[in-house]
């Protein structure tokens, strides 16, 4: 046990358990990722120094912050709030998988300039008054496309990278006409948790906010009747477990 560090999420892969890692003020080192011994729960390995890879930031700010996303089979991916690199966890080590470059990424110099601001909420308020990019999340990949989200001014942006054409497309507006009826115009904002070459999995009702929204969508008949298993939604209540939905990629 180390009272100067804690974890929020775990990831199992290839017989090992990994956790994200956050540290309190006064910690001797600030790593972002650790491996945990499955027998005694002690941390055995540490990776990704926060200063080098996350602009020095090593606090948990967003309660539902999800640094891991796992392929159904294969290497889990890992990225933190201010990282410009998505890492792959392999059976042997941790490897950079995708590096993103933009002059608009939040910089270490900018975060250092906020050190006198003691409250993280104020730091993010200041950040959202800029046009800086942060929080790469919801990463997934098919045979042809790479998809991920990022934020500017607390607004969600969507990026598609076409491996065949070697080109990227950015937008804020992708309508989720798969889950919702066509005329609703509901924006695509899934919480992806896993993917493979043919489909992606998202989770709904995994917190109070998404639970209330999803239950109201069902009540208001906003869910597309073409969704397989939609009849089972009628028995869902606020006491139900989270709902996992999968989206199939088109060829």
What do the predicted segments below correspond to?
Residues 1-30, 43-58:
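Asp-box/WD-like beta-propeller blade repeats and closely related beta-sheet repeat scaffolds
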Residues 6-15, 22-24, 58-80, 125-143, ...:
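Structural signature of eukaryotic scaffold interfaces centered on beta-propeller domains
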Residues 19-21, 78, 148, 202:
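Residue position within the beta-strands of beta-propeller blades
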Residues 25-35, 82-89, 152-161, 208-222, ...:
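Structural motif
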Residues 36-95:
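Loop-centered beta-sheet repeat module
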Residues 53-56, 96-130, 163-197, 209-211, ...:
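Conserved blade-ending motifs and adjacent loop-strand segments that build the rim/top face
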Residues 96-116, 217-251:
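Predominantly five- to eight-bladed beta-propeller fold
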Residues 135-185:
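C-terminal structural cap/anchor segments
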């Amino acid at each position: 046990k180390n009272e100067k560090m804690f974890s929020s999420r775990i990831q199992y892969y290839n017989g090992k358990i990994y956790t994200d890692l956050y540290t309190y003020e006064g910690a001797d080192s600030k790593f972002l990722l650790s491996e945990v011994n499955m027998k005694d729960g002690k941390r055995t390995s540490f990776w990704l120094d926060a200063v080098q890879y996350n602009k020095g930031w090593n606090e948990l700010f967003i309660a539902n912050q999800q640094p891991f996303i796992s392929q159904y089979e294969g290497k889990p991916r890992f990225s933190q709030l201010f990282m410009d690199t998505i890492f792959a966890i392999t059976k042997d080590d941790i490897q950079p998988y995708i590096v993103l470059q933009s002059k608009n990424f939040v910089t270490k110099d900018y975060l250092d300039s906020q050190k006198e601001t003691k409250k993280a909420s104020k730091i993010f308020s200041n950040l959202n008054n800029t046009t800086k990019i942060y929080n790469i999340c919801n990463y997934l990949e098919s045979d042809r496309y790479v998809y991920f989200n990022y934020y500017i001014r607390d607004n969600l942006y969507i990026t598609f990278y076409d491996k065949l054409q070697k080109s990227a497309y950015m937008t804020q507006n992708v309508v989720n006409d798969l889950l919702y009826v066509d005329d609703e115009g509901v924006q695509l904002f899934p919480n992806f948790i896993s993917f493979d070459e043919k489909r992606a999995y998202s989770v709904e009702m995994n917190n109070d906010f998404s639970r209330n929204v999803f239950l109201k969508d069902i009540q208001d008949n906003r869910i597309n009747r073409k969704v397989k298993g939609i009849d089972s939604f009628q028995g869902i209540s606020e006491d139900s477990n989270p709902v996992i939905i999968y989206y199939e990629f088109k060829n």
